[in-house]
């Protein structure tokens, strides 16, 4: 697989971005988001990086420094947002409280919080598009996880562009790596000798996603592509029957699928 070609084709086929768009890329410091910002810059898009400093000790410090260096070398503007300043608490504290209060796993909490901060800051930066580094493996895992949870409808928004359409006032979230296998992105990032951390997040253990990733280890990239492509055929039907519309959260004003967004639901008692 040619990762650059697949990204370029996905952007064209799904009309993910225009050259005139202000494209904000959510940078975790890992191989996926680093590759996608590099490729989009190379393809001529107007990109800038947005990194949330999660305050996870040395891990975050190294990511921050490496991303500063990478963006500097590639002439890419970078904004770093301090999670503790944004929320008044560190991520570990919030996770510990929510584990006790609502038995929510760390990755769920981290995902909801990151999404909320990224949306808010993308708007502040005047983004037309907010890019994340989600890849084919992430999407195949989602299909399987939702099926095993007995709730295929959870995948109703699965698409290279979230919601499949633009919502006024919000930066549309797009996933140019939607059809790129993780193994190929890893090869790509290494071939480019990106000076980044290649390990997974140290906090990601003991979660349903981690288990699912392990179960899927024996499935080939081609099969993963078929899973994702077949599910994409189902999405319009799910969407038509779901009645789910993206609305504005009545508390914080961010995009939501119900009156209160997931962030406001989980964070209100902390
Ligand atoms: P993950 O949920 O960690 O697999 O990350 C999925 C995507 O979310 C990454 O490819 C990034 O685009 C984005 N992301 C994750 N962590 C961060 C972070 N600390 N700051 C900004 N974006 C992030
Ligand atoms: Zn809210």
Predicted regions and their residues:
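Short cysteine-rich clusters marking metal-coordination/redox-active sites
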Residues: 1, 248-252, 261-264
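ATP-dependent adenylation/nucleotidyltransferase module used to activate substrates
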Residues: 1-157, 182-191, 261
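Alpha-helix C-cap/termination motif
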Residues: 42-43, 73-74, 124-125, 218, ...
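Catalytic subdomain that performs nucleotidyl-dependent activation
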Residues: 137-220
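An accessory alpha-helical subdomain
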Residues: 215-234
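Long, charged amphipathic helices and adjacent flexible linkers at domain junctions
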Residues: 234-243
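Short metal-coordination and nucleic-acid-contact micro-motifs, chiefly zinc-binding Cys/His arrays
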Residues: 245, 257
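Cys/His-rich microdomains that often coordinate metals
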Residues: 256, 268
